[in-house]
Amino acid sequence: MKRLLAILATLLAVFVSKAQGQTSQQLPMTHMSGLLSLVETIPLPGDGYMDHLTVDVKGQRLFISGEAAKSLIAVDLRAGKVIHVTEGLSAMPKKPFYLSDTNEIWVTLTDSTVAAIDGNTYEVTKTVKLSGYGDPNRGADNAAYDPAAHLIYAGVEVFEDFGGSGQHGSNNASIDVVDTKTAQLVGSIKLPGGDPAGITIEPSGKRLYVTMGDIVRGDSHVAVIDLEKRAVVAQWPITGGPVPHTAGLDSAHHRLFVGSRMTAHTGDIGGGHQHEPGKLTVMDTETGKVVQSLDSVGGADDLQYDAATGRIYFVGTTGTVALFKEVDPDHFQLLGKVPTGAISKTGLWVPDLKRFYSAVPRHYVVTARHGTQDLQADLLKELNIAQGVTKRDKAAGWQTSMLSDLVIEEAHLMVFDYMP
């Protein structure tokens, strides 16, 4: 049963349709979208989810958090191949940062630590314990980095289990401050909630914006942190974006971008990852007011703003990146949606290279026996039904009809060129 659930949990709405006895596989993004052009696909190792990415522009290396495999993957972008995998990390890696001045990759880990990995040997050389270390209900996830101050601001979330359905706790989350020069924890800022999902920092290093995924009295909110005081100085309700999960910033025009899921990551398996549409909410950082809210792709997990082009890259776990355009600071429009890959939940826009990168984990591609308008929803429904299957049902030969034919698509890195 565990194997069945694991298989079903990774089945996505990428499928092979049968027509007149022929099997025709429809793989993600084999064409030009008019927004991004797929120019290269690089094989990647490992199973399971991957998380955030970071880049060494000068050395032409990309680093990928192998979340499920507890690894860090190093890719040579010039050669188009993986050059090293750092395995055996202490927990799941989440948000990495490449520090060019020390040639290190610093990454947050779900055991409430931050690790430094040497850029030459690819070995872990330093580990900083955060405030949640040793507490199974707390773990580090998203983070922001201030290169001028050499400080990492790591979000430590509170995660509890209620009868098999994971939910974030109501308080005791924090932003922990790590000095990368001394490899020391130098501060901890208490947050008004349990889920610091999205974190972005002003280039000046004066303010940090944290989108809190907690729903309090019907609203989610942004916690505004004064980094000199190291305290929350404001809380702004996010209308139009019920479950915020990521954040980006246009500091020149005082605009905060919030990527939201439309339902919490609880209850039925799939949770907020699979619900369409998601929401992009634009907020004024001078007033805290919502400027605009637009439909986007589901399962918001990453969001980046490119000042040179005025584009917003909104990445969802539904295997799509939505591109928005800043017409002016008060008006934004959806340019289009580009397929990335199944459960490719994050991506990285690199302005210096004018390229977008999407890491697609190894996943199952389904052969549908019958036509369906929403194969992914059907699979998730079967997964939830499968949770209730008893040993007696299993002995009687119960099985899910959706597992009749499976094709495995191996993990890979998709490399896209910018198109004006």
PLM regions with names:
Residues 1-4:
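Positively charged n-region of N-terminal signal peptides that target proteins for export
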Residues 19-420:
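Predominantly soluble domains enriched in secretory-pathway, periplasmic, or organellar proteins
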Residues 6-15:
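Bacterial N-terminal signal peptides
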